Amino acid sequence: MPFRGRVRVTSPFGWRMLNGAKDFHNGVDLVGVYSTDIVSPLDGTVIMAGYGTECGNQIQVYTRFGRTLFFCHMKTLSVRAGETVIQGQKLGVMGATGTKCFGAHLHFGVYEGKGRSGKVLDAEKFLNLK
């Protein structure tokens, strides 16, 4: 799990309505307490850590299983690109950054391959939430 404590899904993976329009949600939104530590659910290498307009502060971790884990809307980042991380290591803290954010939560996504250009996978299944 990418953070400790109670996990509640506020927006599941897949098609949804967003601001009156149909939108494909490429991850799962998990509500939490502002500034809660976000941790890596698997060992891997940080391939991206920075800021993007929609997702705000974000991190991508490439795992030995050939999947990229995507963490979005974080308040602060604790790792940099090129660092190796271990399961349970702090990546940053939960926040509400970016233009596609409606309150403190973590958007968590899973992609096949390195980076976000591969097939998007169901993050809820990855986290055993369904």
What are the residue ranges of the model-derived segments?
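Surface-exposed, glycine-biased beta-strand/turn segments
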Residues: 1-57, 87, 121
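Zn2+-dependent peptidoglycan hydrolase active-site motif and core
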Residues: 23-26, 40-78, 99, 103-109
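Short hydrophobic beta/alpha edge segments that flank linear recognition/processing sites
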Residues: 30, 58-61, 86-100
